[in-house]
């Protein structure tokens, strides 16, 4: 099984950008922790970050046939991108949305996610550990898919 982790705009600035909101952990450190969890679970993982909406849409589309699930932090595109929403819907892969901060506690324009309706769930406001929680959630989804496939073989 393979997880694609997609990081949206400005997440490459973690550790420097608004540490009072996002903390001091760098994106590379978050990815190292996720890689460790994936290694322990025997799961492949790939990381992608872009500040450009079209590149994120392209990466989501490339997941067809190459990934089994997506963990995405669409960052500011959460509130504006119908294109990312539609791409996730089109690929029909289990997707978990992650946010380091809690958008509901921030500006009004951050309170609505256009992405949430096409995801298996959201993990928000737990800081960088939210990515670990998303990994646990995705691994559980993989186990459920495996169990369903096994049960269907027995029919």
From Swiss-Prot:
Catalysed reactions, as listed in the record: 3-dehydroquinate = 3-dehydroshikimate + H2O
Biological processes annotated in GO: amino acid biosynthetic process; aromatic amino acid family biosynthetic process; chorismate biosynthetic process; quinate catabolic process
GO molecular function annotation: 3-dehydroquinate dehydratase activity
Active site: 22, 99
The keyword Lyase appears for this protein: yes
Site for Transition state stabilizer, residues: 17
Keyword tags: Amino-acid biosynthesis, Aromatic amino acid biosynthesis, Lyase
Superkingdom as given in the UniProt entry: Bacteria
Pathway, per record: Metabolic intermediate biosynthesis; chorismate biosynthesis; chorismate from D-erythrose 4-phosphate and phosphoenolpyruvate: step 3/7
E.C. designation(s): 4.2.1.10
Residues annotated as binding substrate: 73, 79, 86, 100-101, 110
Pfam family, one: DHquinase_II
Protein's job: Catalyzes a trans-dehydration via an enolate intermediate.
Subunit architecture: Homododecamer.
Family: Belongs to the type-II 3-dehydroquinase family.
HAMAP family xrefs: AroQ
PANTHER family: CATABOLIC 3-DEHYDROQUINASE (PTHR21272:SF3)
Protein name: 3-dehydroquinate dehydratase
Species this protein is from: Campylobacter hominis (strain ATCC BAA-381 / DSM 21671 / CCUG 45161 / LMG 19568 / NCTC 13146 / CH001A)
């Amino acid at each position: 099984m393979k997880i694609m982790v997609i990081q949206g705009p400005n997440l490459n600035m973690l550790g420097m950008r608004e540490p009072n909101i996002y903390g001091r952990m760098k994106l590379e450190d978050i990815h190292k922790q996720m890689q460790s969890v994936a290694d322990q679970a025997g799961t492949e993982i790939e990381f992608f970050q872009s500040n450009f909406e079209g590149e994120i849409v392209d990466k989501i589309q490339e997941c067809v046939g190459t990934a089994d699930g997506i963990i995405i932090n669409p960052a500011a595109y959460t509130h504006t991108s119908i294109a990312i929403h539609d791409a996730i819907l089109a690929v029909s892969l289990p997707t978990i949305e992650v946010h380091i901060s809690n958008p509901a506690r921030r500006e009004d324009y951050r309170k609505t996610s256009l992405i949430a309706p096409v995801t298996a769930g959201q993990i928000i406001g737990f800081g960088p550990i939210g990515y670990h929680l998303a990994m646990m959630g995705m691994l559980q989804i993989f186990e459920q898919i495996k169990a369903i496939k096994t049960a269907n073989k027995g029919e």
